[in-house]
């Protein structure tokens, strides 16, 4: 006799396997958010043929919203950086929005293209380590399709960080000093940004002055700074000035 018993298995890892979230929101309508997580990377065991020490978590997204349409994306997270959950990922998302005019507020909106997207990179690179110094490079970049993307598709992130920074930097640290340089960019021209192209800084720890008992510590920096208005700011400022004059 032949027995056939189908079964459904699910990984015990909270981020692996298939997960879905149904629900309803005023600006989404009925929705079903789908995610499938698998591990990538690692080396193949020559005996078992299985991958070991997999370090890259990939989460594949397929979302359906009755008022917004379909959205797809993929998130990659470096599990080797578990000590800092705010670093080590690349997140991408794209949605064909069937009604970009929908808002959770009564404020009027400018015309928004139906192609909505996000590209986000947060990563820390170990550039060089020696017994006395550590050199690292950081990238914190978020590129959005429009100023309302986070409000519409990531309300939690919008509440915590409605206008994300875009910074690239490198720093060297030792017991005596920290030397670094970073650049703040205006990747999203619809946001106002305090750009720094670049800024160089030096912090040094407390140390004796000429081998005396007097200690000194300090910080110094130099850079090129510029205040960049968002693309809609001139219109807004002009309107506020006209209203104030009347």
Residue ranges and their predicted role:
Residues 1-246:
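Outer-membrane beta-barrel proteins and related beta-barrel translocases across Gram-negative bacteria
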């Amino acid at each position: 006799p032949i027995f056939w018993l189908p079964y459904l298995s699910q990984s015990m890892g909270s981020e692996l396997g298939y997960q879905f979230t149904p629900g309803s929101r005023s600006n989404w309508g009925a929705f079903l958010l789908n995610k499938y997580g698998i591990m990538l990377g690692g080396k193949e065991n020559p005996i078992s043929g299985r991958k070991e020490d997999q370090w890259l978590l990939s989460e594949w997204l397929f979302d359906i919203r009755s008022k917004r349409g379909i959205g797809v994306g993929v998130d990659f997270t470096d599990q080797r950086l578990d000590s800092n959950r705010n670093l080590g990922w690349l997140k991408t998302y794209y949605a064909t929005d069937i009604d970009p005019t929908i808002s959770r507020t009564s404020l009027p909106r400018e015309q928004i293209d139906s192609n909505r997207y996000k590209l986000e990179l947060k990563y820390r690179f170990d550039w060089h380590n020696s017994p006395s110094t550590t050199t690292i490079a950081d990238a914190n970049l978020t590129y959005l399709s429009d100023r309302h993307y986070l409000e519409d598709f990531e309300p939690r992130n919008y509440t915590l960080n409605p206008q994300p920074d875009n910074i690239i930097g490198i720093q060297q640290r030792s017991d005596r000093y920290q030397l670094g340089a970073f650049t703040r960019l205006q990747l999203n021209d619809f946001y106002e940004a305090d750009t720094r192209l670049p800024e160089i800084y030096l912090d040094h720890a407390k140390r004796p002055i000429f081998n005396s008992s007097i200690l000194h510590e300090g910080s110094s920096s130099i850079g090129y700074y510029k205040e960049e208005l968002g693309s809609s700011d001139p219109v807004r400022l002009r309107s506020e000035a006209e209203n104030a004059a009347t």
